[in-house]
A protein has these predicted regions:
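Acidic surface patches and DE-rich sequence motifs
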Residues: 19, 31, 54
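Short metal-binding segments enriched for Cys and/or His
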Residues: 30-48
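Short metal-coordination and nucleic-acid-contact micro-motifs, chiefly zinc-binding Cys/His arrays
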Residues: 1-2, 7, 25-27
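Cys/His-rich microdomains that often coordinate metals
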Residues: 7-11, 38
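Charged, amphipathic alpha-helical regulatory modules used
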Residues: 42-130
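A structural signal for short, hydrophobic beta-strand segments that form beta-sheets
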Residues: 13-15
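Short linker/helix segments within small regulatory modules
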Residues: 17-26
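Alpha-helical scaffold elements adjacent to nucleotide-binding pockets in ATP/GTP-utilizing enzyme cores
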Residues: 27-30, 70
Length: 130
């Protein structure tokens, strides 16, 4: 990986921890030349690991951007949440789905998104379900 402050520099991992509850890895990295230290959080991309089973036997890939937009559209009542919380909520949904052992379907994505939104903002959950 390259350094965030010096893109021409390579880095090395000096410390690493896996989460026990989520599919995420925390890594402390250090630039080899400058010694600058920074932290990264690595998580699997659902689009590369689980195909979405569509009706009729076709498959599609998970699209985080599409999910972010559909979540943002649920926050008509809260523009701040639409702008700043949609990404984090979509990533929460993606983590939940990546830990789920079942087949990934549009209905499963919608249900997981609805439950996540309801926990965060009940009105947004209702708007999403509508």
């Amino acid at each position: 990986m390259i350094s965030l402050n010096s893109p021409h520099e390579a880095t090395k991992v000096i410390n690493s921890r896996s989460s026990k509850k989520r599919p995420i890895v925390w890594r402390r990295r250090q630039s080899i030349e400058s010694g600058h230290t920074f932290t990264t959080y690595e998580r699997p991309a659902l689009a590369e690991n689980k195909p979405i089973a569509l009706v009729g036997g076709n498959t599609d890939i998970f699209n985080l951007g599409r999910l972010i937009l559909s979540i943002a559209a649920s926050f008509h009542h809260n523009e701040q949440a639409a702008k700043y919380d949609s990404l984090w909520l979509a990533q929460t949904v993606e983590e939940e789905l990546s830990m789920d052992q079942g087949t990934l379907t549009p209905a499963r994505i919608a249900t997981t998104t609805y439950k996540t939104l309801r926990r965060f903002d009940e009105l947004a959950g209702i708007q999403y379900a509508a």
